[in-house]
Amino acid sequence: MKVYNTLTRKKEELVPITPGEIKMYACGPTVYNYIHIGNARPLCIFDILRRYLEYRGYNVKFVQNFTDIDDKIIRRANEEHVDFSEISERYIKEFWTDADGLNVRHATINPKATENIDAIIQIISTLIEKGYAYEAQGDVYFSTEKFKDYGKLSHQPLEDLEAGARIMVGEVKREPMDFAVWKAAKPGEPAWDSPWGKGRPGWHIECSAMNWRYLGDTIDIHCGGQDLIFPHHENEIAQSECFTGKPFAHYWMHNGYINVDNVKMSKSLGNFFTVRDVAEKYGYEPIRYLLISAQYRSPINYSTDIIEQCIAALNRLYTCRDSLDFELKNAADAEHGGDKTIIDGFDKYREQFISAMDDDLNTADAIASIFELVRDINTNVVGKTPSKALVEGAIAMFDELTGVLGLVYNRKTETLDSDVEALIEARTNARKEKNWAEADRIRDQLKEMGIVLEDTAQGVKWHRE
């Protein structure tokens, strides 16, 4: 597998530190509000990266954090006159509602920053001892000029960065690009004891600490949105490599933005849509489909029309899978002469899928290979009085490939099928009795439920509209 490494700006063969194992970290949300569509893209993309690596046989240890102490959380808590932890716990719960709805698997570990204050203090103390950080009036700053490789991820020399930076009023740092790893306590804000007095950690040091505590000195893959390249990931590298004296991460993977009318979606611009709001109208799966429908480094434009296109595409997948279930109920045990050739032919779609995913996680081409499989199934299996072996072969390949992408996960077959089949049976009886008005009424009722009927020689088939 090759992945695009932001650090080197080229596609590179993925070679793990330990054969057969992958250690990866993704920056999680700052939990002060509902996540928006832009926040959800890295969730879905790197969920698929983890799924695919496991599909290819790797043992993946995946850490994704919660930033549960931050200026925005404190501000929200003050507005609502509650403790900061009430805000963070509330939105962690809401995060899981959305993540589960999007079929995002929980990471191996989902640590909170506030659970790792001891590790943060240990790293800061070591940075001060080594001369990479300094204390100033209760704050502690990282000295960027002491790290000769500062700017290597964003490919910006330190002198260029300094030219556009300035020290804000009230800051006591030495140089404009120095950043806080510990912030002195302010009245009314949460604080922890430290060698430099009461205070709280800076954002960047939190991720370095959780990386180190749960994954060790060096990890295979660090991932996140392109907006985190600078300063967050740049600062993580500086802190971590100065602390350990070792490379921080071998591969850096960053997903592209979600745009609205070709402008980046963000809370600060007010042009964002929460996952919850969109899901309440369209469901979660169309959102997941949208977020993985383009190669992950490419921008995606969000619009109602595009969401509706995603719904139509998903309906094709659901219709195919539901049709296979119908065929399986009626399939004969005896195999037909050409079955093995058709089943063996399904293997080429797996090969196309793997080829796409091995090329820097190209989900767009991977999805295309699934739709080629669907065309093959619709041509050679559905409605062809297939054998049980042929249908099972088609189902196995369909479920294998869609499963890697986490798609077609809302098949409510048990309750929905029993309801639908009861109505279909009533309609069939009405037709036998030539009660056409009742048969039409039931058909219309099913259509209102989003179910379309199709009369075939094998019986009545249905699919979602």
Q: Where would I find each of the regions flagged by the language model?
A:
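Short phosphate-binding/catalytic loops that engage adenosine nucleotides
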Residues: 58, 132, 451
